[in-house]
């Protein structure tokens, strides 16, 4: 009887741990907003700003349902000022502002020109 009780407790603990880990992993993957980006070679800051804006409007907002919901639209107004881009030729940090019908959102975009990746994080 005691053995059966111990096995049940261990089993329930294992299930609880598994659920916790699965929720954590799904939250991390949802917040991890990294994807491939075009090569930065021979692009000016203005061209990179235009590519970031295009990437957000064509690729990101269509897949980020929570952001669309918060903004109140699937067609927000997006702007990037090339003069606000910081960093060197390898890593560029780009402030991105998005305006919807419900609210505005600001993102920090990092373009890794060596890895050809783009990552988004929301500024709160």
From Swiss-Prot:
Species the sequence originates in: Photorhabdus laumondii subsp. laumondii (strain DSM 15139 / CIP 105565 / TT01) (Photorhabdus luminescens subsp. laumondii)
Family to which this protein belongs: Belongs to the YebF family.
Keyword ATP-binding among UniProt keywords: no
Domain spans labelled YebF/Cmi: 36-123
Pfam families: YebF
Signal peptide: 1-27
Keyword Signal: yes
Locations listed in the record: Secreted
Gene expressing this chain: yebF
Cysteine pairings via disulfide bonds: 40-113
Name this polypeptide is given: Protein YebF
Keywords: Disulfide bond, Secreted, Signal
Main location: secreted
Gene Ontology CC annotations of this record: extracellular region
């Amino acid at each position: 009887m005691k053995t059966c009780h111990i096995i049940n407790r261990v089993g329930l603990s294992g299930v609880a741990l598994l659920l916790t880990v699965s929720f954590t992993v799904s939250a991390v993957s949802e917040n991890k907003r990294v994807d491939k980006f075009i090569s930065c070679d021979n692009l000016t800051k203005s061209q990179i700003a235009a590519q970031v804006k295009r990437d957000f409007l064509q690729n990101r907002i269509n897949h980020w349902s929570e952001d669309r919901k918060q903004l109140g639209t699937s067609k927000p107004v997006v702007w990037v000022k090339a003069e606000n881009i910081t960093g060197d030729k390898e890593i560029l940090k780009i402030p991105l502002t998005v305006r919807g019908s419900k609210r505005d959102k600001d993102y920090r975009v990092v373009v890794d020109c060596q890895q050809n990746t783009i990552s988004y994080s929301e500024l709160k």
